[in-house]
UniProtKB/Swiss-Prot annotation:
This is Large ribosomal subunit protein uL23. One of the early assembly proteins it binds 23S rRNA. One of the proteins that surrounds the polypeptide exit tunnel on the outside of the ribosome. Forms the main docking site for trigger factor binding to the ribosome. It comes from Thermus thermophilus (strain ATCC 27634 / DSM 579 / HB8). One of its GO terms (biological process) is translation. GO terms for cellular component: ribonucleoprotein complex; ribosome.
């Protein structure tokens, strides 16, 4: 990947993601081909925090219908990043 902003696409904004903020866990949509090491380096570079752990998962796109036409949303990749104790990502804390 080129830069941190090519790896991290957007934060996941959901109640479940907000619940992880108290434990120092932040959830992001990431590039589907990004590795855990690339995700760790991207978060550390973009938000100036120390990353302790990275968990990733693939989310399959849902099948959708528009009239008689079938379609599918794209598959995505989600990363749950845990930062060092005592640290937090200020940019995301303000979204609550």
């Amino acid at each position: 990947m080129k830069t941190a902003y090519d790896v991290i696409l957007a934060p996941v904004l959901s109640e479940k993601a907000y619940a992880g903020f108290a434990e120092g866990k932040y959830t992001f949509w990431v590039h589907p081909k990004a590795t855990k090491t690339e995700i760790k380096n991207a978060v550390e570079t973009a938000f100036k925090v120390k990353v302790v752990k990275v968990n990733t998962l693939h989310v399959r796109g849902k099948k959708k219908r528009l009239g008689r036409y079938l379609g599918k949303r794209p598959d995505r990749k989600k990363a749950i990043v845990q930062v060092a104790p005592g640290q937090k990502i200020e940019a995301l804390e303000g979204l609550i």
